């Protein structure tokens, strides 16, 4: 069996583990995109440390959960967003203005929608977390 969207599967698994009160989530398969999304989430205080574990296949991320995530998920389809259009997607995916993050893939790498707005960049929506 193959996964159609490993990022959506990983974020759903993290959200479910957080919901039942687990302190650690094991995300597999690991990928560079999932690692970069976890890095943004860690920088903004939604998860604790995470580490890559080699298992001889695709690898596993061990993610420490700290009880800060209410919901997280992947955005499908991955909308192309101009720098002026972030507010429309904030209203769609986040519960309130200034609460939560949209994670955006820009030409300068993965970053939050606020960082992209400040730098005047557009990109593709990857995921949300609040």
Swiss-Prot record:
Gene3D superfamilies per the UniProt record, alphabetical: 3.30.1370.30, 3.30.1490.10
GO biological process, one term: translation
Family annotation (SUPFAM superfamilies): Ribosomal protein S8 (SSF56047)
Pfam families the record matches: Ribosomal_S8
InterPro entries in the cross-refs: Ribosomal_uS8 (IPR000630), Ribosomal_uS8_CS (IPR047863), Ribosomal_uS8_sf (IPR035987)
Domain of life: Archaea
An example Gene Ontology CC term for this record: ribosome
Presence of the UniProt keyword Magnesium in the record: no
Keyword terms of this UniProt record: Ribonucleoprotein, Ribosomal protein, RNA-binding, rRNA-binding
GO MF annotation terms: rRNA binding; structural constituent of ribosome
Function in brief: One of the primary rRNA binding proteins, it binds directly to 16S rRNA central domain where it helps coordinate assembly of the platform of the 30S subunit.
Oligomer status and interactors: Part of the 30S ribosomal subunit.
Protein family: Belongs to the universal ribosomal protein uS8 family.
UniProt-listed HAMAP family: Ribosomal_uS8_A (MF_01302_A)
Entry protein name: Small ribosomal subunit protein uS8
Organism name: Methanothermococcus thermolithotrophicus
Gene: rps8
